[in-house]
Amino acid sequence: MTAPNELPRNAFKRALREGQRQIGLWTSLGTGTSAEILAGAGFDWLLIDTEHSPTELPMVLDQLRGMEGGTATPIVRPAWNDAVIIKRLLDVGTQCLLVPYVQSAEEARRAVAATRYPPEGIRGVAVVHRANRYGRVKDYHTRANAEMCVLVQIETRRALAELEAIAAVEGVDGLFIGPSDLAGDLGFLGNNRHPDAVAVFADACARARKAGKPIGILAPVEEDARRYLEMGFSYVAVGSDIGVLRNAVEQLRQRFAAD
């Protein structure tokens, strides 16, 4: 447990740098209670989604609080690559971001800049907020940049063409395949398991690894998740809170269907 006057160490960022495989879960339910339950299940990371869920900033804060003491590092996906949105997420204590729909090296640089205090970036400087333990972390402003982890999503053919350039941007800690969006852009809308789409994902993984950059993916089907791990994906979300809940409750009801 981090002391009240200490800046938390970013365990996920260090694990990626050390080449450790990281298994995660997608969360969209948006409650601190569900996040607390999930964070204690043994996963390495949890993705708090604000792009495709009704989760707003106070709900992110509740989930960050709920995850304290668990095994999982919180990663927050902002709704867009927007410095104002990102600034607010960082001030409530987010240290890992998954930035959606990054199309170029310039957009990746903008994402990184939004997470860095001057002169390295453009993050607004507040004296007291949750991220610096309400002013108790005295060296927060000089150390915060180093603990930020920026992951960017590759979701289009254009982004694929720019993959190496995006990977080379200083401050980008990892790439992430958005399988549904990328499959849709490739002509396989609604079918991210199409063999041709999977082949593109595999090629992107190989290119990222050649560039020396960790790459992740969402794969809620166990067969797919294991295949992507074998391909060399560094961090994989193997399910979602909604999927786990839906499947469990439907299976439970089915066991009593004949009663």
PLM segments and residue spans:
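Conserved anion-binding
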Residues: V84, T94-E170, D181-G184, D259
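Conserved N-terminal beta1-alpha1 strand-loop-helix module at the mouth
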Residues: T2-P74, P78-N81, A113, V150, ...
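Alpha-helix-loop-beta-strand connector modules within alpha/beta enzyme cores
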Residues: L57-D91, A113-E120, T142-N145, R193-G216, ...
